[in-house]
Amino acid sequence: MKALTLALFLALSLYLLPNPAHSRFNPIRLPTTHEPASSETPVLDINGDEVRAGGNYYMVYAILGACGGGLRLAHLDLMNNCASDVIVSPNDLDNGDLITITPATVDPEATVVMTSTYQTFRFNIATNKLCVNNVNWGIQYDSASGQSLLKAGEFVSDNSNQFKIEVVDANLNFYKLTYCLFGSDKCYNVGRFKDPMLRTTRLALSYYPFFFVIKPTVV
């Protein structure tokens, strides 16, 4: 347990240091180690229950007291008619918005979400008719920040379905999110990016992953 705490502390400390990967000339970060399909195991929520395919859950920052809660859909770009920005709530006690997790490969027999397999994510929140489909996750390069940001929008094949949930600590049910380039076995960590202009914490491709736990709607 002490070793895990030290490892998480070091990861968080490294994240807070100046990061050369944040250069606007390098939107794609260091690839993670490719994990074979044989490592597939069910994703578990904080209660130890299997995460159901197509179910609604909260994805919450795993490190308590680090000024981070759940993931939310925010409207940071006033030039966009729909909210499209994925942020980390600054409130540790805020679970964020509900998120639907669905296997990217349609399988009527799939009842649970598996690690190291492709998944799609979408916010399950009320929107107006114009934005009803603009809730699917994808990666989009932002020239202003020089980051490849996690954004919400319409479902885009070969982008919206390229995410994987990977195990960080099986005992604590800690996970990280990776994004894999279509047609490649290279995957990239999705981590926190502190936007200095908007003074908010967003998610982007990064060296240092965003550790999270999955909370059911009823704990």
From Swiss-Prot:
Functional description taken from the UniProt entry: Major tuberous root protein.
Tissue-level expression: Accumulates specifically in tuberous roots and tubers upon tuberization. Sporamin accounts 60 to 80% of the total soluble protein of the organ.
Pfam families assigned: Kunitz_legume (PF00197)
Source organism (scientific name): Ipomoea batatas
Name by which UniProt lists this protein: Sporamin A
Top-rank lineage group of the source organism: Eukaryota
Gene from which the chain derives: GSPO-A1
Family of this protein: Belongs to the protease inhibitor I3 (leguminous Kunitz-type inhibitor) family.
Localisation per UniProt entry: Vacuole
Entry's Gene Ontology cellular component terms: vacuole
Signal peptide interval: 1-23
Keywords of the record: Signal, Storage protein, Vacuole
